[in-house]
Each structure stands twice: as C-alpha cells, then as structure tokens.
From Swiss-Prot:
UniProt-recorded name of the protein: Fe(2+) transport protein A/Fe(2+) transporter FeoB fusion protein
Gene: feoB1
Residues noted as binding GTP 3 in the record, renumbered to the chain: 179-182
Membrane topology, from the record: Multi-pass membrane protein
Pfam name, any one: Gate
UniProt cross-references to PANTHER family, sorted A to Z: FE(2+) TRANSPORTER FEOB, FERROUS IRON TRANSPORT PROTEIN B
Residue numbers spanned by region FeoB: 74-844
Domain of life, per lineage: Bacteria
Amino acid sequence: MRLSELHTGDQAVIVRVEGRGVFRKRILEMGFVHGKTITVVQCAPLRDPVYYRIMDYNVSLRREDAAKIEVELISSNATSSPASNDIGEQSANPDSNESIPTNPTEDISAKTKSEIEIEVKPNGHVIRVALIGNPNCGKTSIFNRASGAHEHVGNYSGVTVEAKEGLFRHGDYKIEIIDLPGTYSLSPYSPEELYIRQYLSEETRPDLVLNVVDTCNLERNLYLTLQLKEMGLPVVIALNMFDEFEKKGDTFDYPALSAMLGIPMVPTVGRTGQGLPELFDTLISIHEGRNKIIRPIRINYGSIIEPAVEALTEKINNQLSLPYSLPARYIAVKLLEGDKEMNRFVGEQPKGLFILSARDFALREIDEHLTVARDAESIITDQRYGFIAGALKETYRSSYKQLKTLTDKIDHIVTHRVLGFPLFLLFMFIMFEATFVLGRYPMDWIEAGVGWIGSMVNTFMPDGSFKDLIVDGVIGGVGGVIVFLPNILILYFFISLMEDSGYMARAAFIMDKIMHRMGLHGKSFIPLIMGFGCNVPAIMATRTIESKQSRMITMLVTPLMSCSARLPVYLLLAGAFFPDSAGLVLFGLYFLGILLAVLLARLFKKTLFKVEDVPFVMELPPYRMPTSRSVIVHMWNKAAQYLRKMGSIILLASIVIWFLSYYPRYSEEAVLISQIEQIEGNPQLDEEKKTSQIEELNRKAHIEQQEQSYIGRFGKAVQPVLAPIGFDWKMSVSLLTGMAAKEVVVSTLGVIYTGDSDDSDEAARRLGERIREDRDAEGNHTFSPIIALALMAFVLIYFPCIATVVAIGRESGHWKWAVFSIIYSCSLAWIVSFLIYRIGILFF
C-alpha cells in the first residue's frame, strides 16, 4: 500500500522508501524510515499536497512523492495518537540488533577513539561558537538574546539565509557567536546546507558548536546532533522551548540522555533568555577542558554496514592526508551514503581515486547481502534513528495526551478545502485595506506637520535660493515620502504576524499545487510573500529552494511583488484619484503583480529553464503566538531602515533633483516683472482680476522655468518613449530617478510640484492635491485616473531598485540575469501601462 492511498485520519507504518537522489535522501533524513508510524492529518484545498504527522512534527508532501513510500495500514480513519509513541521504539531493522548503547561508555571503539577525539583548544579569551539547529527551533531568538542583536525571527523555514555574527562578553571570555542558517541535516541538499557543512569542515571550523534543539520534537532534531558528533565537533545542546515541553506533561531525564550521548544539555527558553547564563557557563567549561560529560560516541551501523565502515576508515587513515580535521570514520560513512560533495572532496585528494574504488567495492559487497528494498543509505539512516529511539526509550516518557492540539484545530480551518483560499485572500485584503485606512490618520498628522514646517520656513526665512532649497528640495522631497511611514509600519505588522505565527508555512502549503503548475516549488511562495516587505531579503531567501531552475525563476519574478518602497507611490496616487476605493486599488495592484509573476514563471519555465520536478517536502511548524517584542523589533528595524533611507539616498536625491530643476534660472524674469507691473497699474481691472491674471502669469512662467531647467530638458528628451502611455516629462523624470529607490519617485514629484507656487498656503497643500490639479501650459490636466493607474502599474513592474538588481546578480552567480531582469521588467512595464492607458481612454 502506498502512502498516497491513505485517507485523512489513517495511520500506517512505513515499510520502505523508493525513488532515488535528493528526494530519497531528504525524506529518509526527515524520519521516513522503516518502522515509523505516520498519520494523515489533512489535504490542501486543491487536494495536493497532503499534511502528515510523523515523529511528533508536521510535514507536507505532494501525492506523487507520497506514492514512492510503501506503508502498512494499522488504523483506518482513526483519531491520531501521539506521534511520540515512536519515541522509545527502535527501528525494526533486521540487519542489526546492536545499534543502541544502553551503557553510556559502551560501544566506543578504542581503535577509533583517537581518530574522533574532540580537541578543545583554548583560543586566548575569545571562543568562536557556531549556532546550528533545525528550522523553527528558536535558534535566532537565542542569538538575539545572547548578542543583543535584533535579527528577524520567524516561525517558518528560511528566515536565516546567511551567517550572522555577534560578539558579547560572558565572564572572562568574549564569545563570538555565528548564527548559521537552519538545516535538517549536513547533507548538501540545498545551498545553505552545503554552506553549513563547508563552514564546519574547513578553516572556518568553530571552537564549539551550540546545537539548538526543539525539546518538543527531540527525535527529529537529534538526527542533526548525531551528524555533528560524527564530524568530531565539540557539541553542546540547548534544549530550547523547554517551557512548551513542560506544558505537554511529558517526562524527560535529560541528564541521563546527556551522559548517554556524551553531550552537555541545558534547558533554555530563547524568547525570554531563561537558561542562557547556564548555557554559556557550560560552553566555557568545555572550552577550558573542565566538563566531564563531553566525549566521543560511535554508532554501530549493523552487521552488514559496520565492517565496510571500519575497512574503509582504515584505508582512509592509511592513504589520505586530509587538509582539515575531519574524522576518517565520518568520511567513510558519507562515502557509503553516496554523498556527492564528499565524493568530490575525496576525489580531489592524493590517492582519493583509490579510496573511491574501495568504496565502490564495499558497496557491491553490501548489495549482495541486502534485499532489493534496502541499500546502504537507508540502513545508515535507519541506524541513526534507531540509536536515537533507543536512547529516548531510556530517558523519555510521553504523557499520551489527546493529540487534537490548537495547531490541529486552527489548521482544520485555515487549510480547509473550501475555506483555505478565501481566508488567505481575505487576510491579504484586510492587510492592504488596513494599510491605507488605518494609516491615513497618522499620515494626515505627519503631513500636516510637514506642511506647517514648510509654511514656517517659507514665512520666516529670507527669500533666496537657500530658502527654495529647504522648502522645495528638503521639505518637499523628504517630507513627501516620510508621511507614509505609518502605512509601511502597518504593512510590516501584518507580515510579521504571518511569519511569527506559522501561517506563512501554511500559505505555502495551500499554494503548492498552483505554484507547481507555474513551474515553481511550493517554497517559492515564501520568498514571493516576503517580497511584499522588501525584494532584497526575498531574493536571498530563494536559497532555501533546492531546485536551481525554480530558484532562478523565483529570483526573476520576485521583483514583481510590490515591496514597501512602492507603497508610498500607490498611496499617493490612489489617495489622490481613488480616495473612496484606495484599499481596493492597492489590493488590485498587488494581485496584478502576483498574476504577472504567475504568467512569467510559466513563460520562463517553457523557454529559459527546463525545471526538474523537485519534491515538496516542508515542515509545518506549530502555531505560536507572536510576541510583542518580536513584532515591535521587526517593525522598529523596518522603521529605522526607512528613516536611514530618508536621511541618505532620498535626501541626496531630493537635493540633486532640486538643483537640476532650479537651474538655469528663468531668462525672461525681467519681462515677467514688467508684465506684472502693467497688470497692477491697470485701473480698468479690479483686484480679483489682477490676482487671477498675475497667478496665471506666474504659473506659465514656472512651467517654462521647469521645462528650461536641466531636469526639464532631460525629461523632454526621454518623454517621447513614454508619451504613448500618457506620461509627461515630470512623470518620466520621476520614473528615471526612481531606479535608485522607488521612494525617490515620490520625492521627485514632491520637489517638482512643491515649487509650483510661491504662496506658502499653496505650497503646504497635500502633494496629492497638487498633482491632481496640475495643468500644462494649455490649461489641460496632466494627470487623470487612467494615467494614475498606468503610472502605478509602471512603478509596480519596471526596473527593480539597484539593491535588488545587485542581489539578483550575486544570488544567481551571473550578472547577465541582473541585466535580463532590467530589460524584461522595463519592457513589460511599458506594454502593460500602454494597454491600461489606451484601453482606459476608450471607455473613460
């Protein structure tokens, strides 16, 4: 029977895993091994993928991948019993009955002890500690608490996509802590896992490894721990989320497990900092050689595999001179597992080909003793999980409470076949509506404050170019952008809730089938959603996607997700031309970006990238209530980033734009003064007509001044390209300057339109009003609702900001893709805006 044939509520025991390559490797390492109990929890709204529970954690698989797993049904449509009933049961492996050392000192070979002996060498008063653990284990929370940093934390895989370093003092030592990306194993299954293994193996090898473990999911998390021990690394375990474990009511003799594994263990609560002083005291005791618990262990891989491991280990010791301190036994096991990176590494060493030949001979001998359904790789994985299960059998007792947890109840609603998609769309609409509606009130207050400051400066500063620079350049440019800070904070508030609660992983789960049809992986959805905040970290988050082709497609379409930098443009124009339906316009723009991403992904899949079918294997973390500290830190970081941008690139851009629009000065100023004097001295005109005619003269003179300025000439030069889509030279200039950062579009419009009048009350008016009422020399409106829509669509699609282009070039490994993203996005923006404008003027 196949796993894909089971129904919701069914329980089965895994018999074997078929398939090959990365899918089989990853699925085995995630606990899908012989003898483990698995329960079907729920299907996605489109019936694919399927949500399973195994070893006390949740994971999703596509049906086509589940069909590769043979199971034996043990309970049909039954209420799930705790997956923790696997804890304490050895893997039913017929090839070995000696995988579990019941005595802490048993099963350590004197022959191999020297080769995997852990050397903890003091390095002055600085200790380099690598922080490593599974995704969602609270690793970054511990990093933030320990180092005082404010790195973003989230309840989904892929929050940390590069190493972060922090330095702090504890006792007499400085501790340099490196937060590595979350990983399930040390197999090079994804770019981040390869990066971690290279970091731990090469000259960057740390003094100590702090392995953060989710105490509520020990069996799954300890698999990585065993791999770290096999590498000969000095390991300390932080039993994180210990408060949640205590609420479960299970009993856990962690000192006994610590002695059994030879690894010191300290209970911690990362979000509150509980247990961290004791944790770092333990690290220091190991560094100083005072800890009596830490020692090497060796897993016996059974009567068939173990002789091959020992023989290959001996050959490696005798034949290879390795550049790094990797244990020979670890290399032997990896070679027998078929680890491609280890094959490459050994093959590059002197006499490496001899070792690979010996490995091939050993595998042939192993195959002669195995059934068709098993191989060396699966037995090695089984034995590791068997070792873990036996150790937990001695130290862990489950309370066997009802498994219908809060996570199950919430998932029954948010991933429901009928309700899943509508709830997701409703949440997104609420996010955009709240961004505009709730943000409008503080935005009005800030805008009034900016206007008041502009009026005061206009009133009390003496006339001159410096006054114009301050009022039109600095206040008009920077002030026009800073008013949108509350809206951006609200947007990040909702994104933070999605990430920290665990809903982000569910969104990827329900969207996987759609993403799969697009040619993308379900995990691509997470970078795309992250793109609503900022495209740069979203592109970096594509590292979690195993398929190179899917990763490339995701990189290229991620800039179509409307980042927070575009939001000020949308709010400005939507508020000016669609005040009663601005939230709906925002939702439509974000939906347009998603729709274009879908279409382009399919196009890229069929033309540029032949996407291989990579399995969707993704853990669904339990729901957690976002802490106020985490949400506030996330929002504060984004606010600080926004304000830094105000004081740097936007301020500089505003000043440059003001200079370009202010010079050269109007050459006919003397004629204008003469005309004004004639009007004022004309006795046939009343005061109202005099004021009206003088205002009209000033308006035309200002238009001519701007058109003759450097920026006006530049805008006129590029306007013919954008004229077919209804854009005048002012809009053209704002789009060109917006290539640096999308907020500069608003600051450019603020500089250009703030100078439209010398009257302080007029200058203090809302920028949106000035844009809406702007007229050309003939008195025609330069803006209309259709042009505003076309401009917003253009800003959505065209040139990613410089930082995004650089990120695409670096992450893809080829700058040609960065250039390609510029060309295709600008071309697509012109086409879409042309269609909006031309179709719009036919009906409106």
